[in-house]
């Protein structure tokens, strides 16, 4: 009897917890990728270019461990009014050790333990709070279907999966009204803070400058069978402090507001989709298009009068019963972004065909090519270019292109065609090509 009495409080606690769980259900979502790999010179090398995987594809070109854990719950539901609390924590690391923490580790130190010049602070892992927000429905009499939200959140992100390229993404801390029915489509409005860490053209760093973005979108406009349109405008407000305005730093004194226009046409094809995106921007948005920005940052330091545009085509299309193809085409331009810059062009082509052997076994190919060109005001030009070829064998929970979890064994070859700006990209600056071999798992739920 004593043993039974001893366990009664524990049993009661477990019962209460289970009852609470049933009454207060928690939605559990997440994403992760991780694995192991080597190159012909040590660990995997993915530095073909800045934003390399966005330019030549991510398959066999990711050396990190990255994960997101999302927990959310509807905490109130009465008379057609609901409140939902959402949260997400993310972690990233290079995956080099078993125990990975945020402890600071300098790559090289002096005898007394201080960092020497030229040494980097190497943290094993970085953790971040990505989302924490409240979303409420049924509160607005003029639009009961709309969502009123505030906090930190992923906000209507548009991306190309095969390259992990986000081209329309103002995620951050903010507030807004989402999904107001207006004619055939829905209107959303948001105010989000996207501060700019001050980066001069010469590479020095300064205090962050406050930047606020106003985002207006009209989505779900039907055009024809399986065709729809989304349009939007983003207005970035550069908001330097009085001290920054009075400083000698020209990037703060001359920072200008910018406007970005986006139109995205979506067409359903054979059970897949194709998207064509047109974007135009002024001032700091010129850097967004030249340097593969997603709009979560605004290049406030750009020279007065800068502008740019970007054209994107991407999608995933079935080709018969056994093949599916993912693709990306990107062309971006930034004009007059700093005193010596006339025009910066970037282009990318990525294709990922996949053959399904059965419901769980597939072979994947991925090829990507990019070219960057910087034309100066004196008429001279510099170019970087390169490519990646990947072959992978994969096992996944289903035959679809999107089936996950998935485990892949891969081999990738990366090489530079031109290296006038970057120089040799591999083997500590001594080689212009490399091989990567590895195994990676990816999952979302």
From Swiss-Prot:
It comes from the Bacteria. Gene3D superfamilies: Porin, LamB type. The record marks 31, 66, 99, 273, 402, 444 as: Greasy slide, important in sugar transport. Keywords: Cell outer membrane, Ion transport, Membrane, Porin, Signal, Sugar transport, Transmembrane, Transmembrane beta strand, Transport. It is a multi-pass membrane protein. Residues 1-25 form the signal peptide. The keyword Methyltransferase does not apply. One of its GO terms (biological process) is monoatomic ion transport. One of its GO terms (cellular component) is cell outer membrane. It catalyses: beta-maltose(in) = beta-maltose(out). The keyword Ribonucleoprotein does not apply. One of its GO terms (molecular function) is maltose transporting porin activity. The record marks 166 as: Important in sugar transport. It is found in: Cell outer membrane. Induction: By maltose. Belongs to the porin LamB (TC 1.B.3) family. Homotrimer formed of three 18-stranded antiparallel beta-barrels, containing three independent channels. Involved in the transport of maltose and maltodextrins. This is Maltoporin. The lineage of its organism: Bacteria, Pseudomonadati, Pseudomonadota, Gammaproteobacteria, Aeromonadales.
